[in-house]
Amino acid sequence: MNLHEYQGKQLFAEYGLPVSKGYAVDSPKEAAEACDKIGGTQWVVKAQVHAGGRGKAGGVKLVRSKDEARAFAQQWLDKRLVTYQTDANGQPVSKILVEACTDIDKELYLGAVVDRASRRIVFMASTEGGVDIEKVAHDTPEKILKATIDPLVGAQPFQARELAFQLGLKGDQVKQFVHIFVGLAQLFQDYDLALLEVNPLVIKTDGNLHCLDAKINIDSNAIYRQPKLRDMADPSQDDPREAHAAKWELNYVALDGNIGCMVNGAGLAMGTMDIVNLHGGAPANFLDVGGGATEERVTEAFKIILSDSNVAAVLVNIFGGIVRCDMIAEGIIGAVREVGVKVPVVVRLEGNNADLGAKMLSESGLNIIGANSLTDAAIQVVKAAEGK
């Protein structure tokens, strides 16, 4: 689950971290009023969406009058912002963040992520702030500085000082960086975060450090124990298919291809996508129905897959372990009939009662193509998607 920038900065402020004075507004009138509350002669207005690249897409602007702030809000509220991180439909804008203008001398990067290899929280810092950090890591990995947090003792000031010196900070800047580093580490731990970024962390013209942006991603497996963050969720930013899948405890991720995939087990699902790619196909989604592939869940899975107009064929790849393949076949037949599937469906069943399940599918009279192996299934679904 992601938070908006204004929500992330609210959390930063609670931990005493330096952020700009600002207000999240949902009307042009409130945008103008926010300028009065903040004071000054220049403000920054930012469209609030769960995506990067807002500035290049026109979603961030420096304004010099209340009328400009009002006009920006009028332009973007209830519209969709398309950036390089969104699909062609973009993300809906329901709030605008109006902030005091910050005079910047230099931009840095500071972020933290759960590193699965070390099973630790790892902080990353760089002198290359305000740009895509993934590109920096790819092109100039030596510019990424790291500090690994020991979960038994937490973030230590000496780690922050080491990073600060490598970033070229001096005097009071080092003390300020230690404060920000330790505060962010505590925030990361307290709220079960998966990722946190301040990009950019800026040095202002007066020499002080300032958190100019806030990106926060919460571990979805820990949301149940973070009611405060759960209440911050903005469903309008979620893919409606992924939201539908979550209600049925289906793991679904939309992709750009035209072959729908329904598989039980995340590892098998990834392997299925790989072999479809190997044979020239492009998966339209990742969908793991889990161990409880009941007729009801299979029906909902079909509905979700077919809600994507790009889907030209569907591959169902099920391994019957605890759940028998004949029961799965029953569910597939019932789902295809209920949903009224118009595209070819290729089914590969393996495991418990696989032969009986395959027989039921072949005798169903439906447009279901049986496959005798995963390779055969991939070849057949690619041909079906191409209309061959």
From Swiss-Prot:
It catalyses: succinate + ATP + CoA = succinyl-CoA + ADP + phosphate; GTP + succinate + CoA = succinyl-CoA + GDP + phosphate. It is an enzyme of class 6 (ligase). Its EC number is 6.2.1.5. Transmembrane segments: none annotated. The keyword Magnesium applies. It comes from the Bacteria. Its cofactor is Mg(2+). One of its GO terms (molecular function) is magnesium ion binding. The keyword Magnesium applies. InterPro entries: ATP-grasp, ATP-grasp_succ-CoA_synth-type, ATP_grasp_subdomain_1, Succ-CoA_synthase_bsu_CS, SUCC_ACL_C, Succ_CoA_ligase-like_bsu, Succinyl-CoA_synth-like. Keywords: ATP-binding, Ligase, Magnesium, Metal-binding, Nucleotide-binding, Tricarboxylic acid cycle. Belongs to the succinate/malate CoA ligase beta subunit family. Heterotetramer of two alpha and two beta subunits. Succinyl-CoA synthetase functions in the citric acid cycle (TCA), coupling the hydrolysis of succinyl-CoA to the synthesis of either ATP or GTP and thus represents the only step of substrate-level phosphorylation in the TCA. The beta subunit provides nucleotide specificity of the enzyme and binds the substrate succinate, while the binding sites for coenzyme A and phosphate are found in the alpha subunit. This is Succinate--CoA ligase [ADP-forming] subunit beta. It comes from Stutzerimonas stutzeri (strain A1501) (Pseudomonas stutzeri). The lineage of its organism: Bacteria, Pseudomonadati, Pseudomonadota, Gammaproteobacteria, Pseudomonadales.
